[in-house]
Amino acid sequence: MAKKSVSVIAAKTAVHAAVLAPIALLGWQFWQVWQQGSDALGADPVAEIEHRTGLWALRLLLITLAITPLRQLTGQAVLIRFRRMLGLYAFFYASVHLTAYLWLDLRGFWTQIFEEIVKRPYITVGFTAWLLLVPLAITSTQGWMRRLKRNWGRLHMLIYPIGLLAVLHFWWLVKSDIREPALYAGILALLLGWRVWKRLSARRTTARHSAPPPATPR
């Protein structure tokens, strides 16, 4: 049991390091651009920062959604221990993505965000996805699970429309080559399709078990 706990701690440490590596690299490159005027972030550093943080937010969201199917396929219940962590990191990257847009793109004129939301559909869906993530991040603790009881599960089903909105945000943002957003859309469709199939299978199994036995002839 102790060995298993050590393994989980080691795995969580590795996940923390892997997930924080992209933002650490981005921070270092931003510092180089800011202090030395280097081209570490390409010709458009602001666009590069927004792209990378948004992409990692989407990736981590999809990885979070993949935890349940992976647990069901492998039988490894320990995978559930990583779901909350990955979901919070998805929110973290989404928040950095939004902050970069407000601070670097709008240059602090944050009131413009409301004009942008009205004018640009991809910003509308992206901002909506972030807003929906906020209550999920706040209520991700054990304390909130106890307070909300069954409503906790209902609330956290928002992760599904959030995934759809995030993919749509990326799809509308890309102007020409849609191969990358199409790939993420396909992954999301697979993850949601798996859940639908499992739910329908469970209903059929329940219906078979609850059906009355056939009448025996007299």
Swiss-Prot record:
Chief location category: membrane
Coiled-coil portions: none
Lineage: Bacteria, Pseudomonadati, Pseudomonadota, Gammaproteobacteria, Lysobacterales
Membrane-topology annotation of the record: Multi-pass membrane protein
Gene Ontology cellular-component terms listed: plasma membrane
Functional summary from the UniProt entry: Part of the MsrPQ system that repairs oxidized periplasmic proteins containing methionine sulfoxide residues (Met-O), using respiratory chain electrons. Thus protects these proteins from oxidative-stress damage caused by reactive species of oxygen and chlorine generated by the host defense mechanisms. MsrPQ is essential for the maintenance of envelope integrity under bleach stress, rescuing a wide series of structurally unrelated periplasmic proteins from methionine oxidation.
Any Gene Ontology biological process: protein repair
Pfam families: Ferric_reduct
Name the record gives this protein: Protein-methionine-sulfoxide reductase heme-binding subunit MsrQ
Keyword Heme: yes
